């Protein structure tokens, strides 16, 4: 059979789709994507070039394709009474070729031969080149993965990709899209609507070593190296577009082009694991129900990244909340004790208060990580020891800083919220694992641990471990709960949030926690103050609120959480009345059904079941 002749008039260009690594080694690339076999065998970084050959460009001029009628209407001799052109007037843009030679050259031998030419490029062009390379690499990877993995089940695999310059290479199982909020956190720019005086008051800014100060914007190259935050603004009209100011050249930093960056933390965590923790797993959901600043979504991850340049402890604590990262809890808790040993005998002064704040943050993250990733069936005595020791350390820290934080207000919102979050987590942990029941019944008569020492190495701890600290309030928690933490919070913060749903959530939760403690430990609750008027109006309207069933699909997570707490308070205050308890249980089940059928993110649905199923499990009608 004769071969079909190719059309000689068609000019064909030779294309190269192999990786840059094989080309640099002068070997033939098998072109497997996203990682070629050569790089897999030799354990090398597989870079895939995006714009290596500047040969073909196509420009589109909108004026060339305008309808003739429109062009005639734009003639200067058109009628004075002609109708105005209602089509939007596009902003004229200059077409230019983006020179990415420096970005591509940085992949070859650390840019040694190209350093003399860096001064020929403006900082703006260099930055745009890096960002364009990042975007092209990301989009190319996602499209390739979508084709290769269509109809197949994703499996965990290390693709061997790593970061170079500002390039973020997602792992094979990643389905995460770029999120400006996450990129904003990576650069630790506090949200513009937050009052930095509330987050970090002036009294604590004179520290000699304020590791959490957001003044240093240099981050680890394994996360993002000198990438500006993408700012999303509404589309501007022509006049506004012309009035936009030019970019400040001082914000550009290209030190990575002149000197290699190396750090022992370079490959400790994959960037996609960090992004997935915030974007997909939404570890912060339960904690941020109690604050409208989204502290655990926006502030804490940025803080952990910021100080990890010198100390990765808080970042390790944060990553312990991830389902895809295995953090050694023994090493983590020992490091926590080492940091506490440096503070427990030190005087509490303004310059040192942030170090105590970091200890409190670590307690929150370790408790939360265990709570999210350990089911009741998988709970071991070792987990109980960690839970109890974290609560015990919390008691020691409060004893140390109580006088200072109550007499030197305002405290930072992070410090105050960390204290609140630990008490809240203790309550949810107690309900999830039934610690109060175990402490009152199984451990009844057992002498609780009264020593000041916190240890994880004593083998005797893992036989019928003590859970007294995680199950009960310490004296300082009782003081704070009695006045709803008003002796800690910033004055303006309490006023501005008084009408918010997060404040309602806290009012309901504080009341429920105190009532629950009085029921379980009446002998230890003499100092607790209960004000039933705080929630009386809320719970009396709870039974009628659910009549607006059509609106439940559009509620935010805080509204659902408030409904759960209201219904459980009704059950607690109505014990002995089977009809009321049964109606409350029916409404709670209705809430779960609405959540399952709503447009809520699937991860949030799962967390609601994990965090609030106890509202159904506790207190049922008593059969005659």
From Swiss-Prot:
InterPro entries, alphabetized: Zn2-C6_fun-type_DNA-bd_sf (IPR036864), Zn2Cys6_DnaBD (IPR001138)
CC annotations in GO: nucleus
SMART domains assigned: GAL4
Chief localization: nucleus
The keyword Transcription regulation appears for this protein: yes
Keyword list, A-Z: Cell adhesion, DNA-binding, Metal-binding, Nucleus, Transcription, Transcription regulation, Virulence, Zinc
Coiled-coil positions: none
Pfam families: Zn_clus (PF00172)
Compositionally biased intervals (Polar residues): 237-250
Region (Disordered): 63-84, 230-250
Phenotype of the disrupted gene, per the record: Stabilizes the opaque phase.
SUBUNIT field: Interacts with MCM1.
Role, per record: Transcription factor that binds the promoters of genes involved in biofilm formation, which include several key adhesion genes, and recruits MCM1 to these sites. Plays an important role in hyphal growth and virulence. Promotes conversion of opaque cells to white phase, but needs existence of EFG1, a key regulator required for maintenance of the white state.
This protein's name: Adhesion and hyphal regulator 1
Organism: Candida albicans (strain SC5314 / ATCC MYA-2876)
């Amino acid at each position: 059979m004769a071969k079909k002749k190719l059309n000689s008039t068609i000019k064909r260009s030779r294309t190269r789709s192999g990786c840059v690594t094989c080309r640099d080694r002068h070997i033939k690339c098998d072109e497997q994507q996203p990682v070629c076999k050569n790089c897999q065998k030799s354990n090398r970084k597989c870079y895939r070039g995006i714009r290596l050959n500047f040969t073909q460009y196509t420009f589109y001029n909108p004026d060339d394709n305008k309808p003739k009628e429109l062009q005639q209407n734009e003639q200067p001799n058109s009628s004075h009474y002609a109708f105005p052109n209602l089509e939007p007037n596009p902003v004229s843009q200059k077409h230019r070729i983006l020179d990415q030679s420096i970005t591509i050259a940085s992949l070859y031998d650390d840019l040694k031969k190209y350093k003399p030419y860096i001064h020929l490029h403006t900082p703006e062009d260099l930055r745009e080149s890096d960002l364009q390379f990042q975007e092209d690499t990301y989009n190319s990877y996602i499209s390739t993965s979508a084709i290769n993995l269509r109809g197949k089940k994703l499996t965990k695999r290390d693709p061997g990709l790593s970061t170079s310059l500002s390039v973020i290479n997602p792992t094979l199982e990643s389905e995460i899209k770029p999120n400006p909020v996450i990129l904003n956190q990576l650069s630790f720019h506090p949200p513009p609507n937050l009052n930095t005086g509330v987050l970090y008051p002036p009294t604590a800014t004179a520290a000699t070593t304020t590791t959490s100060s957001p003044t240093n914007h240099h981050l680890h190259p394994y996360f993002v190296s000198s990438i500006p935050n993408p700012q999303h603004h509404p589309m501007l009209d022509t006049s506004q577009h012309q009035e936009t100011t030019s970019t400040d050249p001082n914000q550009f930093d290209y030190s990575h082009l002149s000197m290699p960056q190396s750090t022992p933390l370079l490959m400790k965590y994959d960037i996609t694991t960090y992004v997935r923790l915030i974007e997909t797993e939404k570890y912060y959901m339960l904690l941020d129900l109690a604050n409208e600043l989204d502290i655990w979504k926006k502030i804490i991850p940025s803080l952990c990244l910021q100080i990890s340049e010198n100390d990765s402890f808080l970042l390790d604590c944060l990553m312990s909340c991830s389902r895809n990262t295995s953090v050694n809890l023994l090493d983590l808790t020992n490091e926590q004790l080492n940091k506490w040993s440096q503070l427990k005998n030190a005087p509490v002064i303004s310059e040192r208060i942030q170090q105590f704040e970091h200890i409190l943050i670590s307690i929150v993250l370790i408790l939360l990580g265990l709570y999210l990733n350990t089911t009741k069936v998988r709970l071991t005595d070792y987990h109980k020891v960690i839970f109890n020791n974290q609560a015990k350390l919390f008691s020691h820290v409060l004893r140390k800083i109580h006088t200072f934080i109550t007499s030197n207000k305002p405290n930072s919102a992070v410090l105050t919220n960390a204290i609140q979050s630990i008490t809240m987590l203790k309550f949810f942990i107690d309900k999830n694992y039934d610690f109060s029941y175990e402490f009152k019944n199984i451990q009844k008569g057992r002498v609780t641990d009264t020593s000041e020492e916190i240890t994880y190495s004593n083998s005797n701890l893992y036989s019928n471990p003590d859970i007294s600290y995680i199950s009960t309030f310490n004296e300082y928690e009782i003081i704070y709960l009695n006045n709803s933490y008003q002796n800690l919070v910033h004055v303006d913060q309490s006023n501005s949030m008084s009408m918010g749903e997060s404040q309602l959530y806290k009012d309901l939760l504080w009341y429920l926690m105190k009532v629950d403690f009085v029921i379980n430990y009446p002998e230890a609750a003499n100092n607790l103050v209960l004000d039933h008027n705080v929630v009386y109006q809320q719970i009396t309207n709870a039974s009628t609120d659910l009549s607006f069933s059509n609106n439940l699909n559009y509620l935010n997570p805080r509204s659902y959480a408030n409904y759960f707490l209201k219904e459980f308070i009704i059950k607690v205050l109505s014990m002995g009345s089977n009809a009321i308890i049964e109606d409350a249980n029916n409404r709670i089940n209705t809430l779960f059904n609405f959540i399952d059928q709503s447009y809520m993110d699937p991860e949030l649905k799962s967390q609601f079941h994990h965090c609030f199923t106890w509202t159904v499990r506790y207190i049922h009608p008593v059969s005659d």
